[in-house]
UniProtKB/Swiss-Prot annotation:
The lineage of its organism: Bacteria, Pseudomonadati, Pseudomonadota, Gammaproteobacteria, Alteromonadales. This is 4-diphosphocytidyl-2-C-methyl-D-erythritol kinase. It catalyses: 4-CDP-2-C-methyl-D-erythritol + ATP = 4-CDP-2-C-methyl-D-erythritol 2-phosphate + ADP + H(+). InterPro entries: GHMP_kinase_C_dom, GHMP_kinase_C_sf, GHMP_kinase_N_dom, IspE, Ribosomal_Su5_D2-typ_SF, Ribsml_uS5_D2-typ_fold_subgr. Belongs to the GHMP kinase family. IspE subfamily. Keywords: ATP-binding, Isoprene biosynthesis, Kinase, Nucleotide-binding, Transferase. PANTHER family: 4-DIPHOSPHOCYTIDYL-2-C-METHYL-D-ERYTHRITOL KINASE, CHLOROPLASTIC. Catalyzes the phosphorylation of the position 2 hydroxy group of 4-diphosphocytidyl-2C-methyl-D-erythritol. Pathway: Isoprenoid biosynthesis; isopentenyl diphosphate biosynthesis via DXP pathway; isopentenyl diphosphate from 1-deoxy-D-xylulose 5-phosphate: step 3/6. The keyword ATP-binding applies. ATP binds at P98, M99, G100, G101, G102, L103, G104, G105, G106, S107, S108. GO terms for molecular function: 4-(cytidine 5'-diphospho)-2-C-methyl-D-erythritol kinase activity; ATP binding. One of its GO terms (biological process) is terpenoid biosynthetic process. Its EC number is 2.7.1.148.
Amino acid sequence: MTAPLSLGWPAPAKLNLFLHINARRHDGYHELQTLFQFVEHCDYLDFKVLDKPELKLHSNLAGVVADSDNLILKAAKSLQQHTKCQFGVEIWLDKRLPMGGGLGGGSSDAATTLVALNQLWETGLSATELCELGLKLGADVPVFINGFSAFAEGVGEKLQNVEPAEPWYLVLVPQVHVSTAEVFQDPELPRNTPKLSLESLMNSPWQNDCQSLVAKRHPQVAKTLGWLLEYAPSRMTGTGACVFGQFEQEQEAKDVLAKLPASIQGFVAKGANISPLMLRLAQC
């Protein structure tokens, strides 16, 4: 077994550079086309391998039971059960990404847990096998395990690696919770965007089909997006509430961040086509 204590495993945020909803399936899920890109802004997880099969989790968010916390333990347990691993783990989560918001933080934490423990427990699963486990935890988990910017189709499980530009982003976090389930159940959600080839999509204006609905239902999202659009091309990520503006230079994004009203939180981060998680795995 590898060294029992392993530090600094990143769980990066993702952005949906576009999100098109093509149809609603008979099972209630939605057919979609989307482009995922990572940003270099992450949660961090530390792992201590235990010689008995118990699972422990600590977080810097004292007293807060977040979806990401639950998914971390679910991920560890799923790998443990699938591989019949007799080791356990103690995990420390340094939560830096906003919870909810469309940045994929909970799914990313779960993916990092699967990737790290597969290495530390020496369970030997392939990336494909890890993705199959991850998909049972959440539709976005496989893209974080895959570790590369990706075009996704189906319900988000069919991935094709792509290399969009890697600009700087200013990501803003409206102080409102948007329910993904409510967005996808809303009768006013557009569900008829035509399916296009990847080549056509990469050369077309990008949009998020959820954006207008979420902005209508949540004025704080509309207000935040309107403010950011004064400075840069901007969209919502996922089902919100976070929005992002694109900049060529880091300083441009930081200059706009400095003007941000005190009531809105935000951060500047660079787009990354290779996940920081993959770079950490390569160090093992």
